[in-house]
Amino acid sequence: MMRPVVVKEKQLNKSQIHAVEDEVRQAKTMDRDIVTHAMKQSVAKLNPKVMIKNPIMFVVEIGFIITFILSFLPSSSSSIPGWFNITVSLILLFTVLFANFAEALAEGRGKAQADSLKQSKKDVFANVVKENGDIVQVSATDLRKGDVVIVKQGEMIPNDGEVIKGLASVDESAITGESAPVIKEAGGDFCSVTGGTMVVSDEITIVITSNPGESFIDKMISLVEGAARQKTPNEIALNTVLTSLTLIFLIVVVTLPIFTNYLGFQIDTAVLVALLVCLIPTTIGGLLSAIGIAGMDRVTKFNVLAMSGKAVEAAGDINTIILDKTGTITFGNRMAHTLLPVGNETIEQVGKWAAISSVLDETPEGRSVIEYVQGKSISYNRELAEQGEFVPFKAETRMSGVDLQDGTKVRKGAVGAVIEWVESQGGTIPKDVNQKADLISKEGGTPLVVAVDNRIYGLIYLKDTVKPGMRERFEQLRQMGIKTVMCTGDNPLTAATIAKEAGVDEFVAECKPEDKIAVIKAEQDKGKLVAMTGDGTNDAPALAQADVGLAMNSGTTAAKEAANMIDLDSNPTKIIEVVGIGKQLLMTRGALTTFSIANDIAKYFAIIPAMFTLAIPQMEALNIMKLTSPLSAILSALIFNAVIIPLLIPLAMKGIAYKPMSSNALLSRNLLIYGLGGVIVPFIGIKVIDIIVGLFI
């Protein structure tokens, strides 16, 4: 009888357990430090020079000062007890402190991230290559743009640059958090290196691309600390509306005593201040800055560096996303799948010239051709190719190859491009070239034509696959009202097959860099906001033109400088998540604004009857909450007004839950939850507070 096999779960050893416990303990300590710092900052921000930047809370602070002074200047004509003024002033003080705490807490999280980044900025020495070839050691702070530096295994890259010689594995965990090293090599779109990262194997020569204080890490520190944070257009517009409302209510409250005197009664100053504070939108006024800062923080936690809050907001308003096929929609590892000879050519001839065209080609496709030919034991003259002059692939020509020493020109590339090249040299095109190219394209592959001078030998079948789950993600974007456009250098048949399989709305085949700009401009001319991803120098113009340009951290310096967002993980599909974060930011701001304004309805029913009931008994009909007394009603409304701010801080920091759906459906949902909820919650809250306050009055 067979004994049952017992599979044991993998157990953590003691050192691993202690390491995890240390990380948890450090995280708790950091959170505690952030909260402690935020509490101190909330007091420091009481400085009027700081408070005036938030007009709504500045008015509340002025109210606190007035009521605090009145607490020590008793009036014989006032019917309000002395303790009332001091109580109102304390409630107003806490209202301002809670608002300051929300902003300081959001800023504190950014500061914590900045501190961790500063740790990666160590003072290192760089091996600078002088013009005469001598190598001199200098401090990284003395490096300037254009300096050439050699970085060896185990050394830290001293500043941002581009690899001009060599190939090395680089540990970028200090920047990206990803422990797996990445390959950096001269030429192509993966030559960019970042200061503060470590070379873990081999040796590279780089040219410095930034001066001290201008490096990628310097920019990250500046952004996450908030030094470079400016209010976004939407934030400014909302702030203007809220400030205007505050000004209107201020005028109403200031002129109110004129009318009450005419009616034969007076309203105490503390009551007028309480009325003003309850009328103005203090909830959103206290949380507005925190929402914006937290939105940037969420993007940063997602390993995306946003150059401004405007970029994050623009992501939330995106109508069209331009996506590259290779590496974004598909895995991007197009490998040689088979060789197809044309006319009377043989597979050995196709393999021979395909290999010769690829010997000096360091792209994954070129290497896969060599591997395929060697795997099929097809012979070719490697030295012949190595002695020739390599012709790199260009987006404009859509071909690559080699010019041999005897004048022979070998090319491989897109069907249309190679056919045009052969015809320009007087060659004839075999009848089955297009037929076999179409067959490859219909299967979702990419055909590359192999030609020597004016003669076509055959085709290379490159195979790529669509990433799983892409169709579902594009369907989510469609539900959000966002159109997807796939740009690819493939021929129309291949592009159509991939587009259908992935579920994109439109595609642009045989796309050149200028075509991307044309697509972006065409969408923008329709009044739409456009997002796109890119990593190459040829993507830079389109990234700059797009409303949201997401560059890959592994890409070139030109691409990163042109974009307004950089993905530290170099994952092009992350643009979809960035759009979601942008929408979440806008929705959070809108929802809390709706909630704040809806709150005022309950406050009106609490404080207005309390002010006028004694002089106008008919106003008692408005006391639908049956509050204990006029003083209790005023204090209850003020306490709720203050307490709701810290209660909403987690929501402001985290953002409201977002589900892909149409704009109309989102509007209806949020109006129901935050509009109706904004009316109901304060009715309940004020009544509960009134019951408690009534026990002490």
Swiss-Prot record:
Q: Which residues bind Mg(2+)?
A: D535, D539
- Cysteine disulfide partners in this protein: none
Q: Where in the cell is it found?
A: Cell membrane
Alphabetized, the UniProt keywords read: ATP-binding, Cell membrane, Ion transport, Magnesium, Membrane, Metal-binding, Nucleotide-binding, Phosphoprotein, Potassium, Potassium transport, Translocase, Transmembrane, Transmembrane helix, Transport
Enzyme class at the top of the EC tree: translocase
Catalysed reactions listed for this entry: K(+)(out) + ATP + H2O = K(+)(in) + ADP + phosphate + H(+)
- TM spans, by residue? 55-75, 79-99, 245-265, 271-291, 605-625, 633-653, 677-697
- Enumerate the active-site residues: D324 (4-aspartylphosphate intermediate)
Translocase listed as a keyword: yes
Q: Which family does it belong to?
A: Belongs to the cation transport ATPase (P-type) (TC 3.A.3) family. Type IA subfamily.
Subunit structure, as described in the record: The system is composed of three essential subunits: KdpA, KdpB and KdpC.
- What is the protein's given name? Potassium-transporting ATPase ATP-binding subunit
What is the source species? Answer: Bacillus cereus (strain G9842)
Lineage in the entry? Bacteria, Bacillati, Bacillota, Bacilli, Bacillales
